[in-house]
Amino acid sequence: VLARLHSDECFDEMGLLKGGMQLIDEEKLLRIMSVFEGLETTLASGGSAANAVSGVARMGIESGFIGKIGRDAYGRFFREDMERNGVQTLLIEGEQASGCAMTMITPDGERTFGTFLGAAATLCAEELSVEMFEGYDILHIEGYLVQDTSLILRAVQLAKEAGLSVSFDMASYNVVKDNYAII
C-alpha cells in the first residue's frame, strides 16, 4: 500500500523513522492504516522475490511464486496481480492476515516502509512439496528468507530434487555477514 504524505509530521504518530524500513506488528499496522484513511493510496504487489518473478514473467519466461497469504483482500489482490503479470501462483492460505508493506512517500521524495510480514512469515518447511518446484529451471530465494534455516534448507533440497539451480538475492551486506555459514 503506497501513500503520498503531505508532511513528515505523522511519523511520530505511526511510530516510524523517516527513510527506514521497520518490521511492524498488527497493532502498528492498524495505526498506520488509520493515518492512511484520509490519503489517496495505491495497491501493488511486491517484495523483492515477487518483483523479480513478475519481471521475468513479463519477459515471457514461465514463472511461479511460492508463498503464503491470508484469506483477505490483500491476499486476493496479491494472487490476482501476480497472475495478471503472468506468474503461476503457488500460494498457501493461512489463518493470519496477509503481509503488506505500508509505503510512505514524503514531499521530498523519501520513502519509508512499515512492513507487516503477516501470513508470509508463517510459511514452514512442511508446507513445501517437490511438485511445487517441478517444471521450473531456477529457484530464486529472497535474502531475508535465510533467517528461517529449516525453510530455506527444505526449499533448496526440493529444488535440487526437481533439478533446479538455486539463485540467492542476498538483499544487503548484513544478511550475508549474519548468515554466512548457511549460505
Named regions from a protein language model:
Residues 45, 71, 148:
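Charged, low-complexity surface patches
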Residues 49-53, 75, 152:
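A general structural signal for well-ordered alpha-helical segments in protein cores
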Residues 1-64:
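Glycine-rich phosphate/adenosyl-contacting loop at the front of the ribokinase-like
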Residues 70-71, 96, 173-174:
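Conserved beta-strand edge residues that scaffold enzyme active sites
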Residues 54, 58, 80, 157:
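Short, well-ordered alpha-helices that flank and scaffold nucleotide-derived cofactor binding pockets
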Residues 34, 63-89:
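A glycine-rich beta-to-alpha transition motif near the start of alpha/beta enzyme domains, typified by
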Residues 1-19, 41, 81-93, 103-183:
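Ribokinase/PfkB-type carbohydrate-kinase core domain
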